[in-house]
Every structure is written in C-alpha cells, then in structure tokens.
UniProtKB/Swiss-Prot annotation:
This is Phosphoenolpyruvate carboxykinase, cytosolic [GTP]. It comes from Bos taurus (Bovine). In eukaryotes there are two isozymes: a cytoplasmic one and a mitochondrial one. Belongs to the phosphoenolpyruvate carboxykinase [GTP] family. Its EC number is 4.1.1.32, 2.7.11.-.
Length: 622
C-alpha cells in the first residue's frame, strides 16, 4: 500500500511520488496543512526529472489538456477556456494590515497602483474557496528557485498546485526539483498555494478540457507572511506563481526590506567592435518589445547583443559599488503574436523544441501560427484557431489570442549570455525606460541625474497592452512598467530608488528613456526599430564609457547630430524623431504632475515633487 498523508480522522491522500520524510520540516508542515485543507486524493512531490516531465506531458495529452505538435521536437499546445486568457488586475490583491503599506491613498477614487484587501475580507474569501478545492485531484509539490541555485541573490519557493500544466511550465520557467530542496535545507522559502478551483466530480463540463473557475478567481499576496495564494485561474501569470507574483510583487517588498531592487526589466549585454562589453537593464510595459530588444540581432557591423533575461531583473549593489543583476527566471514566457523571423529571429530559433504554446493557432500539419508570424501557409494547410475551430480570415477575429504565449527554456536561446547564470550577477551600467508613445517623445534621451532618472521612471506612459484585460488605444500611466506589479506603496518604492544615491561607493548606472514608436502625421513609424535599435544602444553604450556626444535639452540629454550612426538607414526624419515640442511637454508635465499628486498624494517623495517643478521650469524657458 502506498504511503499516505492523513489527518487521523476521515481524510487521507496517497503519496504517489517522493516521500514526505525527504522534505524539510517547514515544507512538510506546509504540504500537510494545505492537503488537509484542500483534500487532494494524491500528493506528488516533484523531482524535476526528465522522466517525470514526460509522464506529466503524456498524462495531459491523454486527458486532452494539451496536444503534441508533431512538426517540432517535444512541443505542445494548450488551448484554455476563453474566460482564462490573461492576468486579471481587478482580481489580484495584496493583503496588509494597513492599506497604506500596499498602496498610496489617492486624493479621490481608486488607486491605480495596486489593489489592497483587508485581512478580514481575505480570510472570508479564502474560506469560501479553498476547503476541499482539490478533491479528486493530485496536489503537486513544486520546489523552485528564483535565480541560479546557490546565488546569493536567489530565493526559494514551494508551490502547491493541482495543475500538471503548472508543473511542466514551472519546470521551464524556474529551476525546479530535488536539487532545490537540497539547497533549501531548513532555510526560508515563500509559500505558494494554487488551485484551479475545480474539485471532482465537476459540477459543470470544462471548456477545452481546461480547468478554471473564473467567477471565483483571486490572486492574493501576503507579504508579511511570505505567502502567495491563487485560486480559479490556470493562465500563466496567475498560476506560475514564481513569475509576476513572486519575482515582482513579493520580491519588490523583500527588496525594500533587504536593500535591493526587483524590477520588470530585461537584462542584455552589448559588446562593441573593440570587444568592450556593458550590461543594461530595461523596463518597458508589455507589448513594447522587451523580448525583441533582449534578443536583438544588431544591424550595426561588429556589435553584438546577448540576452541575460527578457522580463525580470533582481539587482543589488555589491561591496565594490557595482549594481549586480540576475535574471531570476529560467525560461521565457513570451507573447507569440508579432514574433517572426523579421522581428525576433532568436526567439523563433529558441521555440523550436521543448516549448509549451498556449492559445496560439495550430496548422493542420502540426505546427503553430499567429498574427504577425510572417510565414505563408503551405498549400492545402488549414488553420485551427485558438478557439479550436477551423479558421478563415473572413471570420474577422484573430487566429491566435492577442495574449497567446510560448513557454520555452532560456538555455535554448542562441544568443543567451555566457554569464546568464553567474551567481554574482552581471554589472549593470545603464538603465533604460521606455514606452509606446506615438507623439511627442523623442527616440532617446538621457536623464540629467539619478534623481531625474527616477522621476523619468515614475512618469512612464504607454499605449495599453494585450497582457492585461484593457481594450482600445489609450495612453496609460505605467510607472517603471511596474503598474500591475508593485508589492508595496509606490511612494515608498520611489523613496527606495532615490535612496540608492545615498549608498556609500555606489556606482549609479546612467538612466535613459527610449521610444521606438513615434509616428509621423500620416501615422507611419518614424523609426524602423528591431535590429536598427542597436544604433540607439550604441549611443547609450558610448555615453556609459564617456564618449557619445550629447546636447542638453529641458527633458534630458539627446544625441548630437553626428553621435547616432545612421549609415545605411535610408530616409529617416531625424529632426522629427528628436523634435521636442514646448506645447506637448507643457501638457505632458501637467498630466504627470496631476497623476503623481492624485495617485501618490502624501506619499510622493519631496525630491520627485522638485523634479516635476524643475522640469516645468525648464520647459517654460524653451
């Protein structure tokens, strides 16, 4: 008879893999108490092995949860319930005793900088959802490390889930398995509890064999207890709890307490033709080309870009004052639509094997397809849309969901940086902010100081995105591209960033802002983007090494006329790309001031107020 987990009364669960005795005591207690609450039939302690992964994938294939894509090596397609396709900001909450620990109290209306829930309300919500929620299912115990095992910058989590899709995705996105338990020992870990919220027998049939409970979806973070609790959604951002939940919301709070930074940033290395290398971190809201920039093929001869990470950076000053960064993830969870050989050839090479696709279209010959893939379909090949039906362009809706994803191992990226898993991290010398701004904002400018740079991050705005549930083309505020991911009060977050300047011996990176998306009057992009963005990286690189020419403007330093290498580019209206309109910037600074005063209110650091006033003053003198 297999070993059992029992409450000594009327409940017991079979241990179908691994042994409770192999778990550190605190992990074992977490597993036992959660099992007694959620009542799974079986408990499976994940070891992260290839054999376990194969078994889970075949099990899901038999259940009709995923489908094998025969055109590629070990690639799979999951189609979700159409009600479970994205992060849901309205159902994502942070629980602290005081509301102001989570969000600044706005002058009026709701905070746009996070969602607070009281401990009492959470208690009620939890008790409605979790008791018995895993009946008839298997509880998987996933030990995972955010960051390379053994790095002083890494953190460990234990996720309990009833979704094998989560297990196989977490194996790609994190370092996962027995080695993590060995590294953990009796150390601290973040407790992550996830359920799709569909105990068996089902009350109503599943859509696409995808288990979820949209009516009761809730993603909750309890930073004081180091716990993340997610219910009702199987979608990546809500169920792979190492990703945004741990690596940003929980980690930003840990970072504040421990004196480091957890940021929504890619990390890339740039090497010039002389062999000099510099690392940059960059924060863009989703749909602004973060993954494309992280994996860029530069068009400039002799320049090389290598990828450390495409989404999240954990950064800490070392003893020598260098800002060291690791990518806490182990894979890429990228938006598929728009990814093509033209826009991101390295991503296309990365996803040819060992990849789980979600909500993309399928070709009748066992391949994948999406809007912007730029590949003609072979004769007689049909398309099955993400809704599982044969697709016709005349349908008037996309074949792939706009937020469809690939989940793929970072190690497969052809330009992965040789130091991407270096335990001490890579030294960051430039930080780039950016957004999708069709008018008014120049291609690139450099902040006048660290304090001004922090203000530039706070003032980030961008056209809205598919990764969240908003629709339509509105310019949204998204400070530091962290709008949906702050783990604590944004006013305190700004103070934390500003405090970096007070660190003894800190070598502060230069801060830049880019906008690849400025348009001309006819609505055409002024800048070709993609690999040509290497020309802008070259200028930033030169600024970091003290070489690139720049002129001061009211909003920051912009490249001198000859400082940007435009050879071979053809017709680019540089004058329009860098035009700074007094009228536009007067409106922009008013909008930023209004937003910060209303949203951050009394928690706005005085230094940021000073930066607003100084910018106003400089613009008025144009």
């Amino acid at each position: 008879m297999p070993p059992q987990l029992s409450d000594g009364l009327n409940y017991s669960a079979k241990i179908v893999r691994g042994s409770l005795d192999s778990l550190p005591q605190a992990v074992r207690s977490f597993v036992e108490s959660s099992a007694k609450l959620c009542r799974p039939d079986q408990v499976h302690i994940c070891d992260g092995s290839e054999e376990e992964n194969r078994q889970l994938l075949s099990h899901m294939e038999e259940e009709g949860v995923i489908k094998r894509l025969k055109k590629y090596d070990n690639c799979w397609l999951a189609l979700t319930d159409p009600r479970d396709v994205a992060r849901i900001e309205s159902k994502t909450v942070i629980i602290t005793r005081e509301q102001r620990d989570t969000v600044p109290i706005p002058k009026n209306g709701l905070s746009q900088l996070g969602r607070w829930m009281s401990e009492e309300d959470f208690e009620k919500a939890f008790n409605i959802r979790f008791p018995g929620c895993m009946k008839g299912r298997t509880m998987y115990v996933i030990p995972f490390s955010m960051g390379p095992l053994g790095s002083p910058l890494s953190k460990i989590g234990i996720e309990l889930t009833d979704s094998p899709y989560v297990v196989t995705s977490m194996r790609i996105m994190t370092r996962m398995g027995t080695s993590v338990l060995e590294a953990l020992g009796d150390g601290e870990f973040v407790k992550c509890l996830h359920s799709v919220g569909c105990p068996l027998p089902l009350k109503k049939p599943l859509v696409n064999n995808w288990a979820c409970n949209p009516e009761l979806t809730l993603i909750a973070h309890l930073p004081d207890r180091r716990e993340i609790i997610s219910f009702g959604s199987g979608y990546g951002g809500n169920s792979l709890l190492g990703k945004k939940c741990f690596a940003l919301r929980m980690a930003s709070r840990l970072a504040k307490e421990e004196g480091w930074l957890a940021e929504h940033m890619l990390i890339l290395g740039i090497t010039n033709p002389k062999g000099q290398k510099k690392y940059f971190a960059a924060a863009f809201p989703s749909a602004c080309g973060k993954t494309n920039l992280a994996m860029m093929n530069p068009t400039l001869p002799g320049w090389k870009v290598e990828c450390v990470g495409d989404d999240i950076a954990w950064m800490k000053f070392d003893q020598q004052g260098n800002l060291r960064a690791i990518n806490p993830e182990n894979g890429f969870f990228g938006v598929a639509p728009g990814t093509s050989v033209r826009t991101n050839p390295n991503a296309i090479k990365t996803i040819q094997k060992n990849t789980i696709f979600t909500n993309v279209a399928e070709t009748s010959d066992g391949g994948v397809y999406w809007e912007g893939i730029d590949q003609p379909l072979a004769a007689r090949v049909k398309l099955i849309s993400w809704k599982g039906k044969e697709w016709d362009p005349k349908d008037g809706e996309p074949c792939a969901h706009p937020n469809s994803r690939f989940c793929t191992p970072a190690s497969q990226c052809p330009i992965i940086d040789p130091d991407w898993e270096s335990p001490e991290g890579v030294p960051i010398e430039g930080i780039i902010f950016g957004g999708r701004r069709p008018v008014g904002v120049p291609l690139v400018y450099e902040a006048l100081s660290w304090q001004h740079g922090v203000f530039v991050g706070a003032a980030m705005r961008s056209e809205a995105t598919a990764a969240a549930e908003y629709k339509g083309k509105v310019i949204m505020h998204d400070p530091f591209a962290m709008g949906p991911f702050f783990g604590y009060n944004f006013g305190q977050y700004l103070a934390h960033w500003l405090s970096m300047a007070q660190r003894p011996a800190a070598k502060l990176p230069k801060i830049f802002h880019v906008n690849w998306f400025r348009k001309d009057k006819a609505g055409r992009f002024l800048w070709p983007g993609f690999g040509e963005n290497s020309r802008v990286l070259e200028w930033m690189f030169n600024r970091v090494v003290g070489e690139g020419g720049a002129s001061v403007t009211p909003i920051g330093y912009i490249p001198d006329e000859d400082a940007l290498d435009l050879r071979g580019l053809g017709d680019v209206d540089v004058k329009e790309l860098f035009h700074i309109s007094k009228e536009f910037w007067e409106e922009e600074v008013e909008e930023i001031q209004k937003y910060l005063e209303e949203q951050v209110n009394v928690d706005l650091p005085p230094e940021i107020k000073n930066q607003v006033l100084a910018l106003k003053q400089r613009i008025s003198q144009m």
